[in-house]
Amino acid sequence: MAGVIAVMAGLSVRTAPTLVIFDFSTGSGTVTIPASPISAVIEVWGGGGGGGFGLEGVGDNGGGGGGAGGYSKTTIASLTGQGGKTILYTAGVGGTGSNTPDPGNTGGTSSVSSGTYTITPMIAFGGGGGTSDANTIQGQGGTASGGSDTNTTGTGGNFLTRAGAAATAGVAGLQGGAGGDGGLPTIGGDRGEPGLPGRVRFVFTI
């Protein structure tokens, strides 16, 4: 079994490393580094912005799509002797879509910071909300900072197609914090869709 030390003929043989994964899309908390850690990869996505309000006869394009949250990634090459120490995290919420001729709400900020283990703070801001179709502005992508590997600004939403921005793909194509679609240009108006929540993912190799 992976991660288990087998004793055969008086010899200790360690099998392939094991992955311990913590994956959060809501709230704040503490992650404890598992025992006998080797290394870690940490990814942070900000929450997606909400879509804008759509109303027929104003711009007839519908509301602007919300922007995607920023993305930050850090690799910790060596965690020897750090088992039991803690790291703090917050996963940002998705922004709500607009139900009035106002922009959708900005997505929440996601972050990783030091607990008893010292780490450079990682911050991924949420994407901006799309505007109503009375304006020609889509939600802007959130920025990111602090990652040792990557800090990527999220893609902006689309005004003409109402589409919310796709999230930045992380390791193995995983995502978080896509923007919400803008509302349809209908009589009486159509509410924008909410952005998807941010995400914080820890993958420890032990």
Stretches with model-predicted labels:
Residues M1-V41, T75-I76, L196-I206:
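Enriched but not universal
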Residues D23-S28, V44-S114, G130-G141, S145-T150, ...:
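Glycine-rich strand-loop-strand elements at beta-sheet edges
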Residues A172-D181:
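Outer-membrane beta-barrel transmembrane strand signature
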